[in-house]
Each structure stands twice: as structure tokens, then as C-alpha cells.
Amino acid sequence: MSYFEHIPAIRYEGPQSDNPLAYHHYDPDKRVLGKTLAEHLRIAVCYWHTFVWPGHDIFGQAAFRRPWQQPGDALERARMKADAAFEFFTKLGTPFYTFHDTDVAPEGDSLREYAANFARMVDYLGERQQASGVRLLWGTANLFSHPRFAAGAATNPNPDVFAWAATQVCHALDATHRLGGENYVLWGGREGYETLLNTDLKRERDQFARFLSMVVEHKHRIGFKGALLIEPKPQEPTKHQYDYDVATVHGFLVQYGLQNEIRVNIEANHATLAGHSFHHEIANAFALGVFGSVDANRGDPQNGWDTDQFPNSVEELTLAFYEILRHGGFTTGGMNFDAKVRRQSIDPEDLFYGHVGAIDVLALALERAAVLVENDRLDALRRQRYAQWDDAFGRKILAGGYTLESLAADALARGVDPQHASGAQERLENIVNQAIYGLR
């Protein structure tokens, strides 16, 4: 059975085409900085927003009528969903996908039933991967939707909930390994608090760290070579989450000795919810040595929640890609579309329109970022700004050649009189705009 029979395979037709079901800027075979666009972008489609979400919101019921979401045998519907998903991936021409365990398999009425259902669907996903050539970018476990996780998973006051969550992660990590996944993501949607009045912060942080340590141990025990990634988010659904932003996650990892084992998966909309730019979070992840992968989406600046819209800003993404390219690009990570069509977008074509447009935006942004990397104008000005630290005096300070007292004595003896230099922000912004809009 075909679920998108009337929709052709999406091909590159160039910027002059007016076909809404074609790529206008994404030519997967085009080479930029020595790699193809497909190799740079490593695009993934997410299971949950694309095939699981029924179009409900907090004010209204499900608006979609997907064939695989209709009542019936749960495992049969899961197989239908997988068939639809892989037909979609294949027609879109995207190389990767991502999932939560309960996206792909019915949870059932017990932990044993969950494990059995998931095992059957992992077998089926393996068959679909082999037939299509589509690969798994990352897997994860849903530890936030069921009411048992209302007070958290790893941070729950009930150790039985901790054990249930550990079971899900054990199975999800095993499945990710078996399916050739390149990363495993841990998102602590309920790992936080609603009120401090009933919360023991130290205990919950210790529990969370113990849980992560167990995941790390299991990764090495089964021989999984992919990266473990935490996805930062400041709040929603909880009032405050312990993985607030990149810097918070890094500090947590260092505190518990996990900084060499876990990196971050950065979502654009989560960055803005934390009061940061997407550019900031990516740059900070590289500065702290924890960059892993990206969830590509956007929020609505007039809304204070996670709207998970498709990315449409070449300007925003150019700066994100600039950081990624200047640091060597993705290794195990990629660009996962953690994005969903709007509730009123009920037609099957809308799923394609959202992804096609966003993929074109990624391609445009990456090519503009490549211009910034190739012309080296931003980096040259940055190097010039810090050049004095590369002189003998600056190197001596950083190498521990002075104490605080001896440095003060030296400064007094030399009568240092620092002169302020321009930060040249306006010039730098002009350089970025020239690259984005093809002015130079």
C-alpha cells in the first residue's frame, strides 16, 4: 500500500523551477568545501512530529486523519506507520531518520509487553532500513509522556519509576545499536521541578547523574560506538529543567565526571526559550568541547513556548553553519528536523512542503556559511582582535609566568596605559550580509 501515491519523488530542479514539490536549492550532489551538500547536512526526518502527532493541541482534539492513526490492532498500525515513514523518507531523498521508542511501537499494558512490542518493531525497522538504504541518525526513549513520569524519570521520587525508565533506555539504546544508529539522545523533559517546595535539588541531580552513568556503562558494555547526547531545554513541560542550556549541561557533566562521555544535541527553539540565539548555543558547545548534533526548527518570537516550526531563516542558519563548518563539520551528528506542520495543514502534501522548504533553506544557509569560511574575513578580524595574546607578554600570562602580585608590579613598573580598540561590530555584520545576499 502506498500512502503518498500521488506525490512524486522530490528532485532538484533549480531556482527557476516553480514546482512546489521540488528542491530549488538543495542539490545533494553539489560539492561545497570538498564535500557534497548531502554529506555536510546529514538530514534526518523525525518520527514523532511527522507520523505520530495527530494534530491536537491543549485547546483542541486531533485534527489529522492519517491512515496509520485510525483504530485497529496496535502492532499492525505501527507497521503501517513504518511503511508510511519509509515511503516518505525515500520520496524526500533524506538519508536519516530519528525516533523515540514509543513512536515506533505500542507501549502496551506492562513493561514486558512494551519490550516485546518494541523488539518486534525493531526487527521491522531493520527490514525497512535494509530495503530503502535510509539510516538511523539517533534513537531515544520517551520518558515524559506517560503519567508515571509526571514527576520525572531519573529524578522521580519513586525508584520504581527510575527502574522503569532504565528499562526503556536499555532497550532503546540496544535497538539504536542494532539498527546502526550513530547517536543516542537523552532529553530530560520531566527532569526538573514544578515547585521547590517539594523538591530536593541535590538528591535529584545525584539521581540524574547516576542514571547517566549507567547509560554510559551500558554503551561501552554493548560496544555502541555512537555518541551519547543530552538535549538542553530550559523549561516546558516542567517549570525548570536541569539541562537548561549548553553551559548548564556542561557544568553538570563536569561536576559528575561525565564530560568526556556525553555531548549535546542542540535544538534551535530550545536555545531561544533559554534566552539565547541558536548561534550562541552552537558556538558555546564547540567552545566547551561538547558539540554533537542539531535539531533544526524555529520558534515564534511572539509565543513563549516550543512551537517546533520548520526553519525558514537563511540569516539565522548561516551563522549556525558558519560555526559548524569552521570547526570541521558534523561527525556523528546531523540536521534533524524536530519540526511539525501546523494544525491546519491537514493534507499529505503539507508534510512534503514543510520539509522541502526547510531543506532548501539549509542548503542556502550552508552555502552562504561556506563563503564566510572561504573568504576568512570574519576569522581574520577575530585573530587580529586577540593578536596581543599571541605575543610574548600574553603567552607568559597564560603560561603561568606571573603571579597576581608580580603581574601587578610589572604593570606598575611599565606604566601600562591600555588603549581601547574598536570591536568593529558593524563591519562584521556587513561582511555577513554580503555573504548571505551575494553582494560579495
Curated annotation (Swiss-Prot):
Localisation per UniProt entry: Cytoplasm
Q: GO molecular function terms here? A: magnesium ion binding; xylose isomerase activity
In terms of superkingdom, the source organism counts as Bacteria
Active-site residues are 100, 103
Give the principal location in a single coarse category.
Answer: cytoplasm
GO process annotations (BP): D-xylose metabolic process
Q: What chemistry does it catalyse, as a reaction equation?
A: alpha-D-xylose = alpha-D-xylulofuranose
**Protein name (database record):** Xylose isomerase
Identify the species of origin. Answer: Burkholderia cenocepacia (strain ATCC BAA-245 / DSM 16553 / LMG 16656 / NCTC 13227 / J2315 / CF5610) (Burkholderia cepacia (strain J2315))
